[in-house]
Amino acid sequence: RVFIGSPGGLEEERRSFKQLLDRYSIVHAGPHDVMFHPVGWEDTTAGVGRPQELINEDLKQCDYAVFVLHDRWGSPTGPTYSSGTEEEFALAEELYRAAKIYNIALFFKDVDKSKRNDPGPQLKAVLEFKRRIEDEKRYLFRQYVHSADFTDALEVHLASWLRDHHKTARGSSMLDPVAETASPISGAGPSPTV
């Protein structure tokens, strides 16, 4: 299961995300008994509770998380976070540290120079977040211009995640704490549906 988090304005990327995961599962992953299942807020079942918490519960069931930002930050979800995407990203980091999620991929869509010269509060929040990510040096993110660039970069991630799954299936993986190439994440590896 692969979660996508993004504020509004990135509907094309969200659509591309779901289409790519479905196509990649059929063409590349399915023959290896692996399915990449897309998960987003659109898939969250309506119910009683704080809406963002219901979305968070879906994120907690995922193996990977993908975040995409452009010129909007989103709306506050409560007193702690200034947007749903920020809350989802914080939760994904917590899940990663607890070895409950295997990886986080972060993408930034390029912003026109004219907008960067006079950013409103939404874009300012995105730029501050990006600056923090750059300063902390904990993520190698991808910047892209067109939706097709995002899809191409995401496909590379899927190929990498599929390779990791194969290594896990053979008993030697970055996800295996006893493997020579151990990473900060430990566990038995992703489920056949990732």
Where are the language model's segments positioned?
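Conserved N-terminal substructure of TIR/SEFIR domains
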Residues: R1-V68, A98-Y102, A179-V194
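C-terminal interaction surface of TIR/SEFIR-family domains
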Residues: D110-T193
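Extracytoplasmic/secreted cell-surface and envelope-processing proteins
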Residues: E12, S75-G78, K115-N117, D152
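Alpha-helical scaffold elements adjacent to nucleotide-binding pockets in ATP/GTP-utilizing enzyme cores
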Residues: S16-L20, L54, D58-Q61, G84-L91, ...
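Short loop/turn segments at strand-loop or loop-helix junctions that form parts
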Residues: F67-D71, F108-V111
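Glycine/serine-rich loop-strand microenvironments at binding/catalytic pocket rims
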Residues: R1-G9, L59-D63, L69, E94, ...
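A short helix->loop->beta-strand "cap" motif at the edges of active sites that frequently abuts
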Residues: E94-D112
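Conserved TIR/SEFIR loop-to-helix hotspot centered on a Trp-containing motif
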Residues: A46-G47, P51, D71-L95
